[in-house]
Amino acid sequence: MGNINLDFSVIWDWMPTFLEGAMVTIVLSLSTVIIGSLIGLVVVLMKMSNFKPLNIIANLYTNIVRGTPMLLQLYVWLYGLPMLGISFSGLSFLGGTYGSREFITAIVALAINSGAYVSEVLRGGLESVDKGQTEAGRALGLSKRETMFSIIIPQAIRTVLPGLGNEFITMIKESSIVSTVGVFDVMYTNNIVKASTFRVFEPLIVIGIIYFVLTFSLSALMKYLERRLNTYA
């Protein structure tokens, strides 16, 4: 076996590039989870609706998204749908990275993917709330919608927080697939640094450390929030 000769001195000058890529990953993941959570909330309300067509649409969406690879979905949104005349334009006022067509499309594709998983997390949280709470709300004269948003959802937040945190952590890691379509995330910096320094292993180690720091920090934050919520429960 050959000796492993690591030289991080040439990598140090590229730290601003790594950090810039890390910021793109954070923005991409945060945007995805926020939009995905909104989509998930709509989907779970559709699943809980008494209107059968909404149930069918929501379940079909969830099954398709969860049953196909995320990379395939990204390619469909970025390359397939434009052939049918459906595409997203870049937003130049956001800059070359955040406003690029690839970045905007990546957020849409990943958010729609995340929404399917978040809907299941939310459904579990909503179903965990005692049904007596719904009956109490209706007894107070609240409509079904008012009961859901005023009583049920606030109580379910504490239950779903760990699941949403896990989804955020998962998205930080899985968002690395956007590097395959040219989005300048932290994983894409590997291509830049490797081509400029001719070092292969060192950039991967740095990127691995960045991912670990991001996910570990988020995990610690979620545990802190859980403790705070349990304190006031």
Language-model regions: role of each:
Residues 1-233:
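Transmembrane alpha-helices and adjacent helix-loop boundaries
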